């Protein structure tokens, strides 16, 4: 009898752990799939990763921002956003203006050229201004709220252990940005050529403008 109880407890524990692991991996996979495509935030991280400038603060800011949005989604903020129609509209037009402006900065940089991996010889932006720009790119993009808050929030409701799902999603985001920020330096030999930077700046500008236009459609 005692052996049967132990066996049942072991089986129940195994099923519980299997469920938690599956839920965690589901959140992990969904998070990475949502941020895998190149976007405003990813392009920003890539650019600074190539320059090897403020990489850790940028990566941590992205990961923490995503974690906050994921928690908000799981906590039901998505339903609140749906209840406030003006919220999405305000974020959309604010995001459009900012993305057009940031795209213009990169377009001008691509036009002027002269950027390369020249270390301390380059003029750098302060850490504070860099992080404020990153936060604006992150939180002024309505797609972030639709994907991270609403989508992840609604999908997490399908799982019994929403905490495991949220942890998986947050760690998925952290893993992606760590790999993008620190892995991009492997491309440094290519971007030692100023022409490569002009191409990257042009691609980033086009990416920002495409996202901005898509918000208006």
Where in the sequence are the language-model features?
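Alpha-helical multi-pass membrane helix bundles of inner-membrane/thylakoid proteins
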Residues: 2, 6-16, 88-90, 101-142, ...
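Juxtamembrane transmembrane-helix termini in multi-pass membrane transport proteins
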Residues: 15-89, 149-164
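Juxtamembrane boundary at the C-terminal end of a transmembrane helix
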Residues: 213-217
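Interfacial loop-to-transmembrane junctions
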Residues: 182-206
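Membrane helix-loop-helix hairpins that form the core translocation module of multi-pass transporters
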Residues: 55-125, 129-130, 183-186, 206
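Internal alpha-helical transmembrane segments of multi-pass membrane proteins, especially GPCRs
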Residues: 29, 56-60, 92, 132, ...
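Membrane-embedded alpha-helical segments of transport systems
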Residues: 60-72, 140, 145, 171-177
């Amino acid at each position: 009898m005692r052996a049967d109880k132990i066996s049942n407890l072991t089986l129940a524990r195994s099923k519980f752990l299997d469920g938690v692991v599956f839920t965690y991996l589901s959140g992990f996979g969904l998070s990475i799939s949502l941020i895998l495509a190149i976007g405003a935030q990813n392009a920003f991280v890539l650019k600074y990763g190539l320059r090897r400038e403020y990489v850790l603060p940028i990566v941590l800011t992205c990961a923490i921002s995503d974690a906050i949005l994921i928690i908000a989604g799981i906590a039901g903020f998505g339903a609140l956003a749906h209840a406030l129609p003006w919220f999405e509209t305000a974020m959309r037009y604010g995001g459009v203006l900012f993305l057009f402006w940031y795209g213009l900065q990169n377009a001008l940089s691509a036009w002027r050229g002269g950027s390369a991996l020249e270390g301390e010889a380059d003029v750098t932006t302060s850490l504070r201004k860099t992080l404020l720009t990153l936060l604006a790119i992150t939180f002024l993009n309505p797609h972030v709220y639709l994907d991270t808050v609403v989508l992840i929030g609604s999908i997490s409701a399908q799982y019994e252990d929403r905490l495991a799902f949220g942890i998986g999603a947050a760690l998925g985001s952290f893993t992606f940005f760590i790999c993008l920020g620190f892995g991009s330096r492997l491309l440094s030999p290519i971007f030692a050529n100023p022409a490569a930077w002009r191409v990257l700046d042009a691609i980033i500008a086009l990416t920002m403008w495409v996202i901005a236009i898509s918000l208006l459609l």
